A protein has these predicted regions:
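Short, solvent-exposed turn/loop segments enriched in Gly/Ser/Thr/Pro and often Arg
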Residues: 22-31
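Catalytic loop of the DD-peptidase/beta-lactamase superfamily, centered on the K-T-G motif
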Residues: 2-3, 8-16, 22, 35, ...
Length: 311
C-alpha cells in the first residue's frame, strides 16, 4: 500500500480532512488554491509548484487550516476524535517524548529564543515555552511554509499556513498567539529576532562576496569545451548531462536543474539555472592522469563520475 493511500485511509478520512491530499497533481485540479511565492533574485514573485512526490513523506501534504485543526484535535485528545480512539494515547505520548537531544545554538537561538532545552521526538520538535512543553514542527517547500504547534498542558494548538517560502513569521506569530491565549505579557517576538536574522543574512552575503572575490581572472579551461560534454553519474542523484550547444555548455539534471554554464576560472564553470528559484551553482571538472575529464563536482550534490562514451 502506498504512503498516499495509507494516509488517506488511516488519517485523512477518519479525521474528515476532505480537502487534504498528498500530490501536486491532485492539488492542481482544485480551483481554490493559494499561489506559492518566493524571493527570486531578490524579488518576491509567484513560483511554480514543484513535483516532489518521490519524497512525499518529507513534506507533500497539501491541506488547509480547517483540516489541519482536526489533526491537532486528535493530538490534543490523546488519540481520540469525535468519540473514537484512532490512535492509542501511549503511541502519541511516545511521539511527544524526547528521542534526540538538540544543542540550542546557531539558528535555534532565533527559532526558540527562551527555550531551556531542545530535543526531537518522533516527527516533532520539543522544547519549553512559558514553563510548559511545546510540541511543534514547521516546514517549507518552494513558495509555501507551514507551522503546526501545540501546548498539550494548555489544550491549545495552532496551525499557520502561508504562501511565502523562507519567512519566519509563522514561528513568531505562533508565540504571539500562545501568549495571548495563556494571558502572558505581549512581546514582539519578530522584532526581537530581527537583529539576529539580519546578522545571518549578512554572513550569507559575505560568504557569497568572498566566493566571487576568489575568482581568478585571465584563465582558460584546460580543454576544448566539447571535451567536457558527456554524461556524469552519481549513485545517489543519478545522471547529469553536459551538452555543447551553439558554442556554450549546458547542464541537464532532472526536470528542475537545467541551465547554461559560463567559464569561471580554470576548469570551474558557473551554472545559471533557468529555474531562478535555484539561483546559481558551480561545476568543477577534474582531469585524470591522461588529461581526460574524469568527474565533475557539483558542491552540495557531490561528485559525479564521467560515464564512458558509447562506441
Amino acid at each position: 500500500k502506498s504512503w498516499d493511500d495509507f494516509l488517506t485511509e488511516r488519517i485523512f478520512t477518519p479525521l474528515g480532512m476532505k480537502d487534504t491530499n498528498t500530490t501536486i497533481r491532485t492539488l492542481s485540479k482544485s480551483n481554490d488554491v493559494s499561489t506559492p511565492h518566493q524571493k527570486v533574485d531578490g524579488k518576491l514573485q509567484p513560483v511554480a509548484w514543484r513535483l516532489i512526490d518521490n519524497i512525499g513523506p518529507a513534506g507533500s501534504i497539501n491541506s488547509n487550516v480547517v483540516d489541519m485543526a482536526q489533526w491537532l484535535r486528535m493530538q490534543l485528545g490523546n488519540g481520540k476524535f469525535d468519540g473514537k480512539q484512532l490512535a492509542s494515547a501511549a503511541t502519541l505520548d511516545e511521539t511527544h517524548t524526547p528521542q534526540t537531544v538538540i544543542r540550542r545554538e546557531g539558528p535555534y537561538t532565533i527559532f526558540y529564543p527562551d527555550a531551556h532545552f531542545m530535543s526531537y521526538g518522533m516527527g516533532w520538535f520539543l522544547s519549553d515555552f512559558r514553563g510548559k512543553k511545546l510540541v511543534e514542527h514547521g516546514g517549507a517547500i518552494d513558495g509555501m511554509r507551514a507551522e503546526v504547534a501545540m501546548i498539550p498542558e494548555a489544550n491549545v494548538g495552532i496551525v499557520i499556513l502561508t504562501n511565502v517560502g523562507g519567512t519566519l513569521l509563522p514561528q513568531f506569530l505562533t508565540y504571539r498567539i500562545f501568549d495571548s491565549y495563556m494571558g502572558q505579557p505581549t512581546r514582539d517576538w519578530q522584532a526581537e529576532a530581527l537583529p539576529k536574522i539580519q546578522a545571518l543574512e549578512k554572513q550569507g552575503a559575505a560568504a557569497q562576496e568572498k566566493a566571487l572575490a576568489s575568482r581568478v581572472t585571465g584563465t582558460k579551461p584546460s580543454l576544448d569545451l566539447k571535451e567536457y560534454a558527456g554524461k556524469y553519474n552519481s549513485e545517489m542523484y543519478g545522471d547529469v548531462e553536459i551538452k555543447l550547444d551553439g558554442g556554450k555548455l549546458t547542464a541537464e539534471f532532472g526536470p528542475y536543474f537545467n541551465g547554461e554554464l559560463e567559464h569561471w576560472n580554470y576548469d570551474t564553470f558557473q551554472v545559471k539555472w533557468r529555474d531562478r528559484v535555484e539561483g546559481n551553482g558551480f561545476m568543477q571538472f577534474s582531469l585524470n592522469a591522461r588529461g581526460k575529464v574524469a568527474s565533475v563536482d557539483m558542491g552540495a550534490m557531490g561528485n559525479f563520475t564521467r560515464v564512458p562514451d558509447k562506441k
